[in-house]
Amino acid sequence: LTVTDAASGRVMAGKTVSLHKGNNKISLPFIIRNPRLWWSNGLGEQHLYDFRTALTINNETSDIQSTKVGIRSLKIINRPDKDGKTFYVELNGVPVFAKGANYIPQDNFLPRVTPELYEKTILDAANVNMNMLRIWGGGIYENDLFYELCDRYGILVWQDFMFACSLYPAEGELLENIRQEAIDNVKRLRNHACIALWCGNNECNDAWFNWGWQKRYKAQNPEYEKKIWKQFTDQYYVTLPEVVKEYAPESFYWPSSPFAREDGGSDDHNGDRHYWDVWHGKKPIETYNKERSRFFSEYGFQSFPEFESVKRYAPCEEDWDIYSEVMMSHQRGGMHANQLIETYLLNEYRKPKNFEAFLYMNHVLQGDAIKTAIEAHRRDMPYCMGTLFWQHNDCWPVASWASRDYYGRWKAQHYFARKAYRDILVSPITDEGEVLNIQVVSDRLKSCNGTLQVEVMKLTGEKVNSYKRNIKIDANSSQTVFSVPLGEALKNTPKEDVFVHAVLL
């Protein structure tokens, strides 16, 4: 049995083995001195070693397997600090701010997803400076190609086990089926450099404690409530973590998303958070600027596909109304969601003159909302160390929270995300004390210098005020590099008549 580096032809390890009937577990340890490391998108190269493992019997090759492996150290740092507990990825000893989105299956009919579509989907993440996708627990364990592409393009994967928004009778044969399914997938995926963590489920813990499920079952039958909770803990606190510990012992297991504490409480100081007060909760978009979490693993804002995509399922002009039967049939959130889009849009902009203009302004609205959230989360670094919006893609032509529609067309949000996810972000913000602050966030691993230019402009294009400063940008940091009282910056010009343009020259 030999292991060979395909690039150099060097035999890394080999030994003579005796095989018995059935499974044979054989270890072939070897050392790679000064290895080329695998980095996530934006931090370095995604070097993959190609190892060929060959079994030779009587001087003939009986079997050969090729495995591409990225060498990296990866930890989820979840330890106490003065505010609660940290929650972030440490890659090759470096804290990494996770920038990305949630991923769902690409089609309701999975055989229609071609290798070309897989590559476009992952490239569309990498090309807007994402470094993480969360595979949502209501979808599927993706095929090998998906993870190979994430390895190739430096996209870390938050991997949910496939359980979502439900309770499962996890005992007996079903619990054993759950265990075997988990074993199959952990073994299949454990050698991929992209795998960042394993998560037990999507929102099941939150549903039990915060959606009223526990109270309802307890009121109906306290003994039944105890039985359900026993099954729940057997599934997410015993079976799944045991599988990860046995088959991928260096991987991190997280019981649920969102999750803060085992008693079901959710707070801003621990774990990850799904934040939906903007959108479902109808709060203003600027509320994003005030919310905190260690890691935002879900939040979102809806839009329709762009007009050319809509015309593929609503080709007739009489259907060009968001409340038409056709458009309502392609709305993931029903009447409620259309009303939310309309309310938010009219709060921010004038009424669009026609259907096409409405779709366009809806795209701008969605993009501005998610940009506001991303910038707020990045400014809060290192307290907050992750932002994954809902969602990266769609599985059918529909109005949804996706930044790319079913046909792969980028919505405005995807372009907004590309800018908000750049390695150096310049983000103006006013605080409650009526001070204009300019924050610069850098994901770079080395400090650098730059010239900051800040211009206060009227909407007519007339310049009200301008500033220019030479600044030092610290590595892997968020810092306020310029502040000025708002009154001084505006020179008595009403706030509603101006905008701030800040740029690094």
Model region roles, listed by residue range:
Residues 1-132, 379-380, 384, 409, ...:
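Secreted/periplasmic carbohydrate-active enzymes, especially glycoside hydrolases
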Residues 152, 168-263, 407-408:
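Active-site neighborhood of glycoside hydrolase catalytic domains
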Residues 35-38, 52, 59-166, 172-197, ...:
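Active-site-adjacent substrate/metal-binding segments within catalytic domains
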Residues 121, 146, 174, 178-181, ...:
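A general structural detector for well-ordered alpha-helical segments in enzyme core domains, enriched
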Residues 198, 205, 235, 242-250, ...:
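Substrate-binding clefts and catalytic carboxylate motifs of secreted carbohydrate-active enzymes
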Residues 100, 137, 159-161, 199-202, ...:
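Active-site proximal loops enriched in glycine and acidic residues that flank catalytic Cys/His/Asp
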Residues 13-15, 80, 110-113, 145-146, ...:
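Short, solvent-exposed loop/turn and secondary-structure capping segments
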Residues 124, 184-188, 242-243, 372-376, ...:
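A generic secondary-structure signal
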